[in-house]
From Swiss-Prot:
It is found in: Host membrane. GO terms for cellular component: host cell membrane; membrane; viral capsid. Pfam families: TBSV_P22 (PF03558). GO terms for biological process: transport of virus in host, cell to cell. It comes from Tomato bushy stunt virus (strain B8) (TBSV). Phosphorylated. This is Movement protein.
């Protein structure tokens, strides 16, 4: 199932976004850094960017995975980024298997990927190799993605950047609130 998309024609230094069917993806080219939820999907998520001349690369990518279930649900999977400019779906990056019952934040400086601004940016974000005792396990978490574009006159390849797990914690644990003691100790 291909994802429909709209053509985006705005100056490169302005913030713009593109909404796709099934997924929502925020493409951030400005200084602001908003978040838009990206629902888990194994379908294609294309990004089309209208820029004039040059090449673009993806940089400063941050992904937050927010569980909607307990860790006891046993939902896990690998986050893949794929180049779908042809039918092979070349793997750009893949994380290790992630426990999707925990909140996870991932960051990457850049993708080893460059594409002409006159074409689509054929990047797929999606979970594969999902493991869950429930058939609906793929829908038991949500993702938000933040990224920016780098613009260059030349096509170049960067050394592969690794995912960094910023932190992984049990997001469903109730954290005790920090309250000041209402009574003071009055010892005579």
């Amino acid at each position: 199932m291909d994802t429909e998309y709209e053509q985006v024609n705005k100056p490169w230094n302005e913030l713009y976004q593109e909404t796709t069917l099934g997924n929502q993806l925020m493409v951030n080219v400005g200084m602001e850094d908003p978040e838009v939820p990206l629902l888990p999907s194994n379908f294609l998520t294309k990004v089309r960017v209208g820029l004039s001349g040059g090449y673009i690369t993806m940089r400063r990518i941050r992904i937050k995975i927010i569980p909607l279930v307990s860790r006891k649900a046993g939902v896990s999977g690998k986050l893949y980024l794929r180049d779908i400019s042809d039918t092979t779906g070349r793997k750009l990056h893949c994380t290790e298997s992630l426990d999707l019952g925990r909140e996870i934040r991932l960051t990457m400086q850049h993708l080893d990927f460059s594409v002409s601004t006159r074409s689509d940016v054929p990047i797929v974000f999606g979970f594969e190799e999902l493991v869950s005792p429930f058939l609906e396990g793929r829908e038991l978490f949500s993702i938000s993605v933040r990224w920016q574009f780098g613009l260059s006159k030349n096509c170049y390849s960067l050394p592969q950047s690794k995912w960094k797990v910023m932190y992984q914690e049990d997001a469903l644990n109730v954290k005790p609130s920090k309250k000041k003691a209402s009574k003071t100790d009055s010892s005579v």
